[in-house]
């Protein structure tokens, strides 16, 4: 199919997370939907749609993060590939799912490296923006490599065509916004091909992360107010346990450090605030 594909799999309003169906009893049955999605988070990120691609705006740290996370993803996927492609498009032939893609901050660099990238997000405005941006900034020959889908990860994983369809999944700065991490990870396992990688970056739940990633970050306008809830942060031990419980093999985790004075990221020996983790489906 030529050009990008825009798919919206929303089956309800983003503000509604349950539906009522007839029941044989005296009371209607309520079926809860999208248990990995928090409507408060959806509302918050819906307000940021126009800021996603501003490299000097409130989300600039995500843009600068590409300078370290893209090489990390690239290096690991080159190890995973059985053949070596042209250096200009080293990810050619790989299909990647970017979960919680926003408007494509990470998706587009991966596309330019040759990957077919499906960006998944529950915010309709982000999907619309990503689709529009793809048409505007990607060369015509790359537009068919970009697809933005409006869906939760568990809804997406419920579709037969998506099962074991991906060579890699990236969940960068996402799991700290998910109310049901176990369901999220189980759904990702269903989507990945065997012997494929899943990449996480997130925030540890420590006293230091409360001070640095919430109070200072929001107080200094490094992140939009209300972006992070410390209680949702996931420790490396918890993330490892969730992955092992869902039949992943954990390779390693590494600390990350962000310097807001120069808007730069670096790998760090300490993981008390930000960290990255690599796991694989056997």
Please state what every model-predicted region is:
Residues 18-59, 63, 67:
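N-terminal, positively charged/glycine-rich alpha-helical extensions of SAM-dependent methyltransferases
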Residues 202, 221-238:
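Acceptor-substrate binding/catalytic loop of class I
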Residues 1-13:
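N-terminal chloroplast transit peptides
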Residues 231-247, 253:
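Short alpha-helix
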Residues 64-92:
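Conserved alpha-helix/loop element of class I SAM-dependent methyltransferases that forms part
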Residues 85-89, 94-208, 277-281:
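Conserved SAM-binding loop
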Residues 264-282:
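Core SAM-dependent methyltransferase catalytic element
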Residues 209-219:
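Short, flexible, mixed-charge acidic loops at enzyme active sites
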């Amino acid at each position: 199919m030529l050009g990008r594909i825009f798919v919206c799999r929303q089956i309800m309003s983003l503000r509604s997370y349950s539906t009522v169906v007839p029941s044989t009893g005296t009371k209607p049955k309520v079926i809860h939907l999208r248990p990995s999605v928090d409507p408060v988070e959806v509302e918050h990120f819906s307000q940021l749609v126009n800021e996603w691609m501003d490299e000097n705006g409130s989300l600039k740290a995500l843009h600068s993060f590409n300078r370290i996370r893209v090489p990390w993803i690239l290096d690991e996927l080159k190890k995973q590939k059985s053949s070596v492609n042209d250096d200009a498009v080293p990810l050619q032939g790989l299909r990647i799912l970017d979960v919680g893609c926003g408007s494509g901050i990470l998706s587009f660099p991966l596309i330019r490296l040759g990957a077919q990238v499906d960006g998944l997000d529950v915010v309709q405005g982000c999907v619309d923006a990503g689709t529009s941006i793809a048409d505007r900034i990607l060369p015509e020959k790359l537009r068919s490599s970009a697809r933005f889908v409006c869906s939760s990860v568990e809804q997406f994983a419920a579709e037969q065509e998506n099962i074991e369809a991906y060579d890699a999944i990236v969940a960068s700065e996402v799991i700290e916004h998910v109310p049901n991490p176990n369901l999220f990870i189980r759904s990702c396992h269903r989507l990945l091909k065997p012997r494929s990688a899943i990449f996480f970056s997130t925030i540890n739940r420590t006293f230091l992360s409360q001070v640095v990633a919430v109070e200072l970050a929001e107080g200094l306008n490094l992140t939009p107010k209300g972006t992070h809830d410390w209680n949702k942060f996931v420790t490396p031990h918890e993330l490892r346990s969730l992955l092992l419980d869902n039949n992943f093999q954990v390779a390693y985790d590494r600390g990350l450090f962000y310097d807001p004075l120069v808007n730069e990221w670096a790998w760090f020996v300490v993981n008390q605030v930000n960290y990255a983790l690599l796991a694989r489906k056997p």
